[in-house]
Amino acid sequence: MDSNSSNKIVLVTGANQGLGFAVIEVAGVRYPSNTYILCARDIEKGQQAVHQLRDRGVAAIDLVELDVTNDDHIAAAVRHVEAQYGRLDVLVNNAGFVRLGHQDTNLSEMRATYNEYMNVHITSVAVVTHAFTPLLHRSPAPKVINVTSGLGSITNVLSPRRMARVPPYGASKVGMNGLTAHLQVSENERVAAGEAKAPRIRFFISNPGLLKTAFSNYIAWGKEPQAGAESIVQLMGDEEGKFDHAMQWEHEEGEMRVVPW
């Protein structure tokens, strides 16, 4: 994708602050011909984000209310995108959460905690992706970029490197990575079987790293969110196929790197 490419319709979930906001900020300046759909659970916070982005030079922004755990919101978002644009070129599944330092006090709380993480980071990614798949298939080169974490890499977790240990969050990201691989294989098999003429969706996983945002309580050693957005923006802009799909990618020390499973 370069400045001469046709307009892309890009939807980012969880985009009113933090990483999602930074993705639209960085991509909007780099690829100004695109239209960016900013999704937010709180419409007022979403409106504030849109104003801030426009002040920073990102002009083509649409706002959609979307709680990824709410099926009515998802269905309404799909209807909006279909009515306004007729297709979707890039879906960035960014919405997520973590509770650092949280301790469950009983088994019921523990079960509820795990269910909430899995619902947001696995089930909702699957449901949102499924809901938008017909619109993605109308794109000439559709992409889905799922946002993971270093805690989603089993290799990294088993290494001695310094990492925050949040088992329910990390396990949910491991699951999301696995889901992404399965979705890519299913899409490959659909194309190979000749069941439909729709273009193949390319699925990617992006690890933005630990960021200095509200998500991490603005942890002191975190990267700026714009730096974390770089891997997502580069995957978004890859039209030459230089990045393998269904792989985990990060942007560190000025280059894109594959993250081990």
Curated annotation (Swiss-Prot):
It comes from the Eukaryota. The active site is at residues 169, 173. One of its GO terms (biological process) is secondary metabolite biosynthetic process. One of its GO terms (molecular function) is oxidoreductase activity, acting on the CH-OH group of donors, NAD or NADP as acceptor. Keywords: NADP, Oxidoreductase. Short-chain dehydrogenase/reductase; part of the gene cluster that mediates the biosynthesis of fumigermin that inhibits germination of spores of the inducing S.rapamycinicus, and thus helps the fungus to defend resources in the shared habitat against a bacterial competitor. The partially reducing polyketide synthase fngA alone is sufficient for the production of fumigermin. FgnA catalyzes the condensation of 3 malonyl-CoA units to an acetyl-CoA starter, and 3 methylations to yield fumigermin. Belongs to the short-chain dehydrogenases/reductases (SDR) family. This is Short-chain dehydrogenase/reductase AFUA_1G00990.
